[in-house]
Amino acid sequence: MGEVTAEEVEKFLDSNIGFAKQYYNLHYRAKLISDLLGAKEAAVDFSNYHSPSSMEESEIIFDLLRDFQENLQTEKCIFNVMKKLCFLLQADRMSLFMYRTRNGIAELATRLFNVHKDAVLEDCLVMPDQEIVFPLDMGIVGHVAHSKKIANVPNTEEDEHFCDFVDILTEYKTKNILASPIMNGKDVVAIIMAVNKVDGSHFTKRDEEILLKYLNFANLIMKVYHLSYLHNCETRRGQILLWSGSKVFEELTDIERQFHKALYTVRAFLNCDRYSVGLLDMTKQKEFFDVWPVLMGEVPPYSGPRTPDGREINFYKVIDYILHGKEDIKVIPNPPPDHWALVSGLPAYVAQNGLICNIMNAPAEDFFAFQKEPLDESGWMIKNVLSMPIVNKKEEIVGVATFYNRKDGKPFDEMDETLMESLTQFLGWSVLNPDTYESMNKLENRKDIFQDIVKYHVKCDNEEIQKILKTREVYGKEPWECEEEELAEILQAELPDADKYEINKFHFSDLPLTELELVKCGIQMYYELKVVDKFHIPQEALVRFMYSLSKGYRKITYHNWRHGFNVGQTMFSLLVTGKLKRYFTDLEALAMVTAAFCHDIDHRGTNNLYQMKSQNPLAKLHGSSILERHHLEFGKTLLRDESLNIFQNLNRRQHEHAIHMMDIAIIATDLALYFKKRTMFQKIVDQSKTYESEQEWTQYMMLEQTRKEIVMAMMMTACDLSAITKPWEVQSQVALLVAAEFWEQGDLERTVLQQNPIPMMDRNKADELPKLQVGFIDFVCTFVYKEFSRFHEEITPMLDGITNNRKEWKALADEYDAKMKVQEEKKQKQQSAKSAAAGNQPGGNPSPGGATTSKSCCIQ
């Protein structure tokens, strides 16, 4: 068989298309595609402009896909697309303008410039300091970015949008232009522009189609780059907020340390060579001694810039963070005006206007005087700058953060502005923490000062203590110089006899005694309870404490020291005479009597409701039991003073228990809580009757802390209301004092609150006092003393006292009712007589049928 020629094979394949296709797919298709994808360069001749064949165009597309797959550098991928487009469009050169927003203004900046079919990337890549920037209202590229549509300009000289300043800079003549936006959704990302058609007078419709077709590659590249960049920025932003947040909440006391910790921690995510933070002086008003020299003409007035809220711009501290080379941090207190971060005037400008300033080419900047030479031995120079204010929640500028030289050499862009603004905004808001801490610290210091002032006026001084502890008279020395035995000897002579003054009796009256004598009686009660020696109470501290308590009560009508003492005396009587002491330890008895003496200290003569209505600070401080909690805190404040602390020698557990008992006892005097606890107390009384022996019940109660606390709470109520159980001669006088204080509150409600008081506090209804007293006894008081007399029969005298006083008040109430009834009857008779007299007047008789008669005429 002879050799087969190429012509014969070609003829055979043309005649058998199906076989040719099958053979090709089986033997060559995979290899061909593999060769195409594996080829490093497309087999297309780019040396001369010519119309590519379909095969060449396919190879170009494969080349672009391969390049996009292998190359992660955005500029290089776009550069390759533009080189291919130069050949396909037969354009002399092409350029890429990136869309960005700087200082809130959109603009286009050259990124790839003068790309042609034989260009090298390094020659076409525009460095940040060599950028050509177009605003959107300038040039054809600005018009394309604004309209978001392709533009084909056949003749630039006839186009109104064309601007020749680039031609002047480059000494190049632009004749025709084909430009198109690269979009990401509805947003412009970049503008790609081809200039000067090589083989024609202008770009054709065919060129537009080619540009749009290959623009899909550029669009995809830019979209991937843009999404990757956004992802990177958001990741950095999240890390910055996370780490700065963690450091902000570590440091709540000082703004400088707070800023430093946050800014130093996030330094790796800021993507810049240096950043500087200037902290502004927050003083709004100068001291008079600083103003006088200005007013006297000795010092010129300040004429520099001011913050939007009127403060002089004075950076009291600058912190420099140097991240290039060897990391360093420099803190400059009271920086001079020529400090490298301030000398340009940019931080002051930002502080004055509150604007974000993004400067892409600092050496070429005319408005700000940036240093154009290296700042230090490292040769570092300022290239681009981003500066923004740090604003707190009050919209006051507290500082300025300035970032220098983005690490990749590009100028700071919109995403950098957003990222840095998030950081500075967070730092500004976090200023609230140290501000709040400082305010709280000042309030705490003021509170301590005021407490010191109060204690100075309330505490028993060295002259007053000599009225009881007469150490100067007896020993010729001060109390603290005496031994406890010497003080005990003086007190034994000075303190009253318990039996003589009847301080353990339920019918005790304070009226014949002076306030100083009441203080002495109070001291004697501690000795009667035998707690002074047992708990090693310093006798000087005991005397000072009781005397200070008497001074702590205000000089008001009823809730004064006499009332405070009476409550303490009744507590003492319930424990001793009422035999309730057997349920409580000596420590608890000490705490209960002390709480009773303290229970109304610093009372203002008005009740809790008035504190709320008048919006008294006490009402804002304490949510419930307002005055009771204030009395408790006042008493604790006195006890915290070493010279007054009668609990100073208790161990920790004893001290905590004593304070706990005082807390319950004083809060329990709130009558609003009385109705909640009396049912529980009644159950305890009922339970006590189920025990056969008193000893078993006592042993049970001593171990039941909750029941003991309920009994103590009811004891405090019984003590607080004990004036109602006193002999009539005493009770009638005390009731008038209580009523007078109520009427004073009623007057305040009328004058201050512009409200009508309740009848109990209305002095215009003073005659109704007996009736109100009967109601108060029946509704509030009787239950307490009836249950206590049932609980312990030794307390029956208190029930007898209230029963007798009710009779007296009831008699007065009946007398008042009878008097009012007589007055009402008399008034009715007078009205009847007046009506009868009016009926006998002419024209006064009613007309027939009930019609009203005329006063001026009558019908005959």
UniProtKB/Swiss-Prot annotation:
Residues 821-860 are annotated as: Disordered. The keyword Aminoacyl-tRNA synthetase does not apply. A divalent metal cation 2 binds at D600. Residues 858-860 form a propeptide. One of its GO terms (biological process) is cAMP-mediated signaling. Its cofactor is a divalent metal cation. A lipid is attached at C857 (S-farnesyl cysteine). Residues 73-222, 254-431 form the GAF domain. The modification N-acetylglycine is found at G2. The modification Cysteine methyl ester is found at C857. GO terms for cellular component: photoreceptor disc membrane; photoreceptor outer segment membrane; plasma membrane. One of its GO terms (molecular function) is 3',5'-cyclic-AMP phosphodiesterase activity. Keywords: Acetylation, Cell membrane, Cell projection, cGMP, Disease variant, Hydrolase, Lipoprotein, Membrane, Metal-binding, Methylation, Prenylation, Repeat, Retinitis pigmentosa, Sensory transduction, Vision. Binds 2 divalent metal cations per subunit. Site 1 may preferentially bind zinc ions, while site 2 has a preference for magnesium and/or manganese ions. InterPro entries: GAF, GAF-like_dom_sf, HD/PDEase_dom, PDEase, PDEase_catalytic_dom, PDEase_catalytic_dom_sf, PDEase_CS. It is a lipid-anchor. Residues 830-851 have a biased composition (Low complexity). Oligomer composed of two catalytic chains (alpha and beta), an inhibitory chain (gamma) and the delta chain. Belongs to the cyclic nucleotide phosphodiesterase family. It is linked to Retinitis pigmentosa 43: A retinal dystrophy belonging to the group of pigmentary retinopathies. Retinitis pigmentosa is characterized by retinal pigment deposits visible on fundus examination and primary loss of rod photoreceptor cells followed by secondary loss of cone photoreceptors. Patients typically have night vision blindness and loss of midperipheral visual field. As their condition progresses, they lose their far peripheral visual field and eventually central vision as well. Rod-specific cGMP phosphodiesterase that catalyzes the hydrolysis of 3',5'-cyclic GMP. This protein participates in processes of transmission and amplification of the visual signal. This is Rod cGMP-specific 3',5'-cyclic phosphodiesterase subunit alpha.
